[in-house]
Each structure stands twice: as structure tokens, then as C-alpha cells.
């Protein structure tokens, strides 16, 4: 592709990025960093640019910054959870499906600069590509403005999803319920599978929550894990109401 075409695409990106940051309530200093964050390798290849101008290095940095930010959030939010639980929660928050949700929610997926072939084959909707760009954006934001601004961005874009349980398995109800029971000194929690029905391709599982030797709630799901999650959710709500 021609230099003129590249210039048109880049200028269009910069205008859209400026508008997006204004919508989100953030400023920026180094637009080149953000352009790199959204430059997929296919875009770089199409215009014969330096192979290090794509977003993979920023993705590497952003991954570490995101883990640190989420770790601090969980450490403060759940003072009674052991390291193992915190690690599982963090892993789910920073996993690919969650990052895609964050990116799509604010339209960052629309900002990605792709090569012509990648665009035609549906690259813009590819989860791995979107999550990589989101991490690269976090890396660019960190380099441009520091960890405090990354934290403010996470408060606006990431943490609300976690707190409202909008991400499947992020603040999983079994963990949430276990933490609550521990805080209230109510004893041990166990789960029993009490029913499994339906054909092999469409099974329905029913599990119950046992607290202090008594079944206090049930949940149904397409998997044993899902039924336990739903049972924990029901039990958690019941105990919160009783309190």
C-alpha cells in the first residue's frame, strides 16, 4: 500500500483515538505510543514498517501492569481471602474473554489497525487479537501517564464489571460465599450433587450447599460447576438477607 494510504489511515486513527479518550475522560501525551498499541503485525507488514512497530512489546508490558493493578484491587477488596483464591480470581479477570469484554464495552476493538487481509478474514472480531490490543493499550497508558492513571482507568472500565458480577466466573459465587461464611464464623461449606438428569447432550445438574450439616440452598446448571455456582449464589443471598 502507498504512503498516502498509510497516512490517511493513521490520521483517521488519531482523530478517533482522541475522540475516544475524551469520551472516557482521559488525556494523553504521546500519541505514537497508542498508535503502536493498536498496530497489529498485519498492518505493519502491509506497509513494510519496522517489525518492532507492532503492539507485541507493549502487550508484554501491559500484561504485567494489568496483573499488578488487578492484584492490588483484589488484595484490598478481599482482605480475608487466601493467596490461592486471589490468584484464581485474578486469572479470571485478566483472561482473554474478560479482556475482550472490557475492550468491546468501550469500543477499543474498533480502534485496532489491521492489514487488509486480516481485516477481510474477520480479525477485528478475533478474541485473541482484541485482548492483545487491550493489554498493549494498558502498556501504552502506563508508559505515557503512569500507574495512577492506569488505576483510574481500571476503576472506570474494569472494576465495575467485577463488582457487579457481570463477568462469568470473575467474582465467582463459591468464593464470595466462602469468604462471607469465614467472616461470619459460620463453619465449613460443602457441595453435594443431588440430581443429574436429561440426555447426554443436554444434561441438567442440581447441587446443594451444606452449611453446618444443613442443606440451605440448591442450584441447577448445565454442568456440575455451574450448578454449584448457582447454589452458592442462592445461599449467599439468603444469608445476607437473614443478617
From Swiss-Prot:
Keyword check for RNA-binding: yes
Amino-acid positions noted as binding Mg(2+) in the UniProt annotation, renumbered to this chain: 59, 132, 135
Enzyme class: hydrolase
Classification via InterPro entries: dsRBD_dom (IPR014720), RNase_III (IPR011907), RNase_III_dom (IPR000999), RNase_III_sf (IPR036389)
Essential cofactor(s): Mg(2+)
CDD domains: DSRM_RNAse_III_family (cd10845), RIBOc (cd00593)
The keyword Nuclease is assigned to this record: yes
Family per similarity comment: Belongs to the ribonuclease III family.
Role: Digests double-stranded RNA. Involved in the processing of primary rRNA transcript to yield the immediate precursors to the large and small rRNAs (23S and 16S). Processes some mRNAs, and tRNAs when they are encoded in the rRNA operon. Processes pre-crRNA and tracrRNA of type II CRISPR loci if present in the organism.
Protein name (record): Ribonuclease 3
Species whose genome carries this gene: Staphylococcus aureus (strain Mu3 / ATCC 700698)
